[in-house]
Every structure is written in C-alpha cells, then in structure tokens.
C-alpha cells in the first residue's frame, strides 16, 4: 500500500523445511505525504509521524513442522498490523509502560548507600569498577535491575525462554546461534527470576524443559541405552534438541 512495506521470507536452507516470516512496517501521519516503494517509505512535508512494525513467523512449537504445521504467519502479521494502527502512539506507549511497570516495580534492591551518578557513562563506571575491584553499589544495583529488564523483555513467549543472544540481533547468524547452553548459561539467565519476584518469566522455561524431556527420552534410549528417564546435552535450540553436539 501507499504507507506500508511488507517483507516476506524464510530462514536460510530449504524453504520447504525452514521457518518463514512476514514483517510489516506501516507509517501514519496527520500531515504531509507518505509514499512506499518495494523497500522504502518516504515521508515528506510532515513534522511528526508514527511507525508501526510487526513481525510474525511460522514457528508454532518445538514439536511442530514450521511449514506443514506452521502458524499462519501471513494472516497473523496482517491482523496485527490492522489492529495496531487503531491505537495512537500515546495509547500504545501507556499500555507498554503499564505492562512493564507491573512486573519491574515488584522488587527493590539496596546495597549499602548507592549514589546515583548520571555524570559518568555506564561504560566508564564499568572500567573503573574493574580497575578498583568493586566498590560501586550503584552500578551493582543497576546491573541487578538490568538483568530483570532483560528477562522481562526476552521471556514472554510460550515455550521460548531467553536465549544466549537476547531478543534482538543485528546478525543473520547470531552469536552462539541464538541457542541455549544448558550446562550453565540458561540457568544463569533465570537466576534472578524468582528471587526478584518475576515467577511468570519462568513459564517459557518450564515449557521448554517439558519439550526437552519429551525429546530427551529418545536421546537417552538411542545414545545411552537408557529406557527410563531422559537426558539433555550441553547445547539445545528452539527445537529442544537433546542429541550430543
């Protein structure tokens, strides 16, 4: 359309067996002229504009084929975009803040008498923290809350816990492939969850472990001759892989 760009594609590999996606970017403004081509949106003569972005994939669970059993990502993306533009920027922002604050505001941490320091950037404080071998309660408190922020942002999708990369990546091939290293890193991601009053964030992890258990029964039997119980190797992925790497 005149104010929308749509990108449809799939992950690398055989398109008959890959996750497919649909991304839609839509622009709205009460003034000026909006024009969209195949790959760009141009807004002319406007002082303000709102950009709406939605993305849907065919992934529908670790036990579902992403094509033959995949989610209707095209219809879902179109439906998301259609509903999204019925909300103003302020309404969406307020809805987001309300959702986030309800979770983030449950926990407070005080370590001695941390002093808020907005004059030195965080990266400088990190370097000084390393050089001084600690001694910055403000930075320690900030990092504890930062970990909670990451968990709130990354652990909201059923069956898909926070991975080693996080929610966003600029890379086609994410570091660590965006997978799960289950010998310590996955556990570390979730250490703050219950102690800092975010038990809901563990639900995707619980679902993922259930998928590991289902697949791990076959790995235990086929690799190790174990007929009862299940196992997981040190790496897994969105498909709940349990075989040795």
For the regions a protein language model found, what residue spans apply to each?
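Aromatic-residue-lined binding/catalytic grooves and analogous aromatic/hydrophobic interfacial grooves
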Residues: 1-245
